[in-house]
């Protein structure tokens, strides 16, 4: 059952979590129901956090990958002699 619950989308989990929070604030539950709702809320929070962490990791990887591509292609030089390429490297280091 927990496996099926973890397949919930971020948006659906967030909506359900907000509904639980509203009901708990209005005290629409008995104590036993409140504890079950709190437990479900914590489960939903964990699911949302996992989805957000995964998305953040993907964004960081894409950003890092794009940054590396920019660095690799941003300083390409055309065929030059070794001495000229060395002096270009020094200038690039001085600039950055």
From Swiss-Prot:
Catalyzed reactions per annotation: Exonucleolytic cleavage in either 5'- to 3'- or 3'- to 5'-direction to yield nucleoside 5'-phosphates
Keywords: Cytoplasm, Exonuclease, Hydrolase, Nuclease
Positions of transmembrane segments: none
Chain residue ranges for the region called Disordered: 61-96
PANTHER family per the UniProt record, alphabetical: EXODEOXYRIBONUCLEASE 7 SMALL SUBUNIT
Assigned protein family: Belongs to the XseB family.
Protein name: Exodeoxyribonuclease 7 small subunit
């Amino acid at each position: 059952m927990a496996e099926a619950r973890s397949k919930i989308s971020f948006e659906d989990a967030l909506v359900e979590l907000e509904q639980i929070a509203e009901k708990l604030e209005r005290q629409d539950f008995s104590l036993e129901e409140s504890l079950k709702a709190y437990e479900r809320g914590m489960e939903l929070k964990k699911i949302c956090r996992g989805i957000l962490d995964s998305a953040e990791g993907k964004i960081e990887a894409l950003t890092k990958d794009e940054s590396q591509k920019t660095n690799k292609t941003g300083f390409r030089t055309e065929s030059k002699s070794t001495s000229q390429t060395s002096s270009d490297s020094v200038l690039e280091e001085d600039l950055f």
